[in-house]
Regions:
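Glycine/tyrosine- and acidic-biased, solvent-exposed loop/turn segments at the edges of beta-strands
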Residues: 15-239
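Positively charged n-region of N-terminal signal peptides that target proteins for export
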Residues: 1-4
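Bacterial N-terminal signal peptides
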Residues: 7-15
Length: 239
């Protein structure tokens, strides 16, 4: 009986050891959207790994019935995580995180059904939020923001639609005061444009049409007095 138990334990140990092995990605092939081990007919289930030339792990993922399932990791050669994401039935789902070599968070990008959905956030290596990019159905859409990488203060914000600037865009002074406000249509300046002194007083204003100044452009001094007025047509001064 004792010998039988020992034999059974050895068999179980061997099976567990085999099951824990990671299949190297070089031995995998894709047929359609499914992963297979070369020469096998059944979609693969288990862990897959990719290594650096020195043998250290570069990437690690889990496959279920031929599709990515669960956490997917990419590593720097120093062993620290470079990126991590989550998959459900072969599609990215949830927040993908990317890291600097130091281990500090570099970005957070939300996914839904393999498409970017929501606000992606980007950070400096010092941990300061430097940009927020909104996505809808994998296309930039919404209010995008850029921050100063040293102070974290808002520098620029823009309305995005269909992947390009559509609507108001604003630039700010380091103090946080509004510097300019310009309107875009399909990524081309179109509509009113205003520029301000840091004290909030209007410095200049005009109108754009299809990317060209069109109409009366006016500049002011810091007391609100008109300094100059020039009329434009299709970007050219009308005299």
């Amino acid at each position: 009986m004792k010998k039988l138990l020992v034999a059974l334990l050895l068999i179980v140990s061997s099976v567990l050891s085999f099951g824990a092995q990671r299949m190297q990605v070089e031995k995998m092939v894709m047929n359609g959207d499914l992963f297979y081990v070369q020469g096998e007919q059944k979609p693969y289930s288990g862990e897959i790994e990719k290594k650096y030339p020195n043998g250290k792990t570069l990437g690690l993922a889990t496959i279920k019935a031929g599709k990515l399932e669960g956490k997917v990791y990419e590593y720097y050669e120093n062993g620290k995580v470079k990126s991590e994401g989550n998959y459900v039935n072969g599609k990215a789902e949830g927040v993908e995180k990317n890291y600097y070599k130091s281990g500090k968070l570099e970005s957070e990008v939300p996914f839904k059904n393999a498409k970017r959905e929501g606000v992606a956030k980007y950070y400096s290596e010092n941990g300061i939020l430097v940009a927020e990019v909104p996505y809808k159905n994998d296309v930039t859409s919404g209010l995008g923001k850029q921050y100063n990488e040293k102070t974290g203060k808002l520098e620029y914000e823009v309305t995005l639609a269909n992947g390009v600037r559509n609507g108001s865009s604003k630039n700010y002074y380091p103090s946080g005061k509004l510097l300019s406000e310009v309107n875009y249509k399909n990524d081309i300046q179109d509509g009113p444009a205003k520029f301000y002194y840091e004290n909030g007083k209007l410095q200049a204003e005009g109108t754009y049409k299809n990317g060209e100044v069109d109409g009366v452009a006016t500049t002011y001094d810091e007391n609100g007095k008109i300094l100059q007025q020039v009329t434009y047509k299709n970007g050219k001064e009308v005299k």
